[in-house]
């Protein structure tokens, strides 16, 4: 087995009440001015003020950038960077789901390294650590609060740039399920399927290790048991807390084993059509699993067993098929669209989408490597 590196934030606060503990632990840190990166909904709902008030108790001032939209753009990064500089912010807090986290990571990275966001597309392109970042999570899916992945949309090229850089790993991650209760069903479903995709892709990645395998399988087990409950009753705290832990475990897995074609393809759909990332993953997942089954059927069966399927006595091929069907059934049960047509994607764009997907950093560790024609066919199979 080749050598491997395991990346994770220094401190990871989990469970009910962890937000207040994380802020209290900033006492004595020396930080004076925080930039809170979030979105308009979080600001209007009072959660941004809640965090700002907690910071005040520790003698820390804060400025707010709440212009983050789903699929954060280069423009958003530049807007946030200006506020950071204008307020002499010495650290960054991201508050929300994957979009605020990714935007904050890019802001923190460019703040210390200079240049443009696109300079850091790819793997470990930066030379200096980013500004310290605390990521406070409000969704159970992307795990961006604890990863070295940062996805930013280049609105000029209409592509999502995958920045995979150890320097954007947050200093502290916070997963307080009390902040997740307000997630609507659709967002709960999309982010939950994103987490399940992380587990599948990390477990079948060419860079998987025994550590990432353990994280991925436990994540898949917890998601299968709790996602539908969390969708049906968002106030079910045991389900919310389980999903918070599950998505974190899936994040530990893919942060260190990387991903595959589902994410490489979903990034293009999100960048080109501005579609929600988790939904794109959910629609593509069974199709990519079927494509990969010819080389990792046994691994797909393993995930199915972890999800609670009675397939231990089946052969690898049959077990993989049953697992893929279970993924389809779960997605349908929580209201995920059936295909890319429902999302508004167009078949005539597939050649361009496939070309960009093959250049995405996430494609490198897919267990079955395809060419332009095969990836085009994969896209088309999802229409």
Curated annotation (Swiss-Prot):
Q: Does the keyword NAD apply?
A: yes
What SUPFAM superfamilies has UniProt attached to this entry? Dehydroquinate synthase-like (SSF56796)
EC no. given is: 1.1.1.1
EC class of this enzyme? oxidoreductase
Name the UniProt key words of this record, in alphabetical order.
Iron, NAD, Oxidoreductase
PROSITE patterns from the xrefs?
Answer: ADH_IRON_1 (PS00913), ADH_IRON_2 (PS00060)
Q: Which residues cross the membrane?
A: none
Signal sequence bounds = none
A GO MF label = alcohol dehydrogenase (NAD+) activity
Catalytic reactions of this protein: a primary alcohol + NAD(+) = an aldehyde + NADH + H(+); a secondary alcohol + NAD(+) = a ketone + NADH + H(+)
Needed cofactors: Fe cation
Top-level taxon in the UniProt lineage: Bacteria
NCBIfam families of this UniProt entry? PRK09860.1
Subunit notes for this chain?
Homotetramer.
Q: What else is known?
A: In Z.mobilis there are two isozymes of alcohol dehydrogenase.
Q: Into which family does the record put it?
A: Belongs to the iron-containing alcohol dehydrogenase family.
Indicate what this protein is called per its UniProt record. Alcohol dehydrogenase 2
Annotated organism of origin: Zymomonas mobilis subsp. mobilis (strain ATCC 10988 / DSM 424 / LMG 404 / NCIMB 8938 / NRRL B-806 / ZM1)
């Amino acid at each position: 087995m080749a050598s491997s590196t395991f990346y994770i934030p220094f401190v990871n606060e989990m469970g009910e009440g962890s937000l207040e503990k994380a802020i209290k632990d900033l006492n004595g840190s020396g930080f004076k001015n925080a930039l809170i990166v979030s979105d308009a909904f979080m600001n209007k709902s009072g959660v941004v003020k809640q965090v700002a008030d907690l910071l005040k108790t520790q003698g820390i001032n804060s400025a707010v950038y709440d212009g983050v939209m789903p699929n954060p753009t280069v423009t958003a990064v530049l807007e946030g960077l200006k506020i950071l500089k204008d307020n002499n912010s010495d650290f960054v807090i991201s508050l929300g789901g994957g979009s605020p986290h990714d935007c904050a990571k890019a802001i923190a990275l460019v703040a210390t390294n200079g240049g443009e966001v696109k300079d850091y597309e790819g793997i470990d392109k930066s030379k200096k650590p980013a500004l310290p970042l605390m990521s406070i999570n409000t969704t159970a899916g992307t795990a961006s609060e604890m990863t070295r992945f940062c996805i930013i949309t280049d609105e000029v090229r209409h592509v999502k740039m995958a920045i995979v850089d150890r320097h954007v790993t947050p200093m502290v991650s916070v997963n307080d399920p009390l902040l997740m209760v307000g997630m609507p069903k659709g967002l709960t479903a999309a982010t939950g399927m994103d987490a399940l995709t992380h587990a599948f892709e990390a477990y079948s990645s060419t860079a998987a290790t025994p550590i990432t395998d353990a994280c991925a399988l436990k994540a898949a087990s917890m998601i299968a048991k709790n996602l539908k409950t969390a969708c049906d009753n968002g106030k079910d705290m045991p389900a919310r807390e389980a999903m918070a832990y599950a998505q974190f475990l899936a994040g530990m897995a893919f942060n260190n084993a990387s991903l595959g074609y589902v994410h490489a393809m979903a990034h293009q759909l999100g960048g080109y059509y501005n579609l929600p990332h988790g939904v794109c993953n959910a629609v593509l997942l069974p199709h990519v699993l079927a494509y990969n089954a010819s080389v990792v059927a046994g691994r797909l069966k393993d995930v199915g067993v972890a999800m609670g399927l009675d397939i231990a006595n089946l052969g690898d091929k049959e077990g993989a098929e049953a697992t893929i069907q279970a993924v389809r059934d779960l997605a349908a049960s929580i209201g995920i669209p059936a295909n890319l047509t429902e999302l508004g994607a167009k078949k005539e764009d597939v050649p361009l989408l496939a070309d960009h997907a093959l250049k995405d950093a996430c494609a490198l560790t897919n267990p079955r490597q395809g060419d332009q024609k095969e990836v085009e066919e994969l896209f088309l199979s999802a229409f």
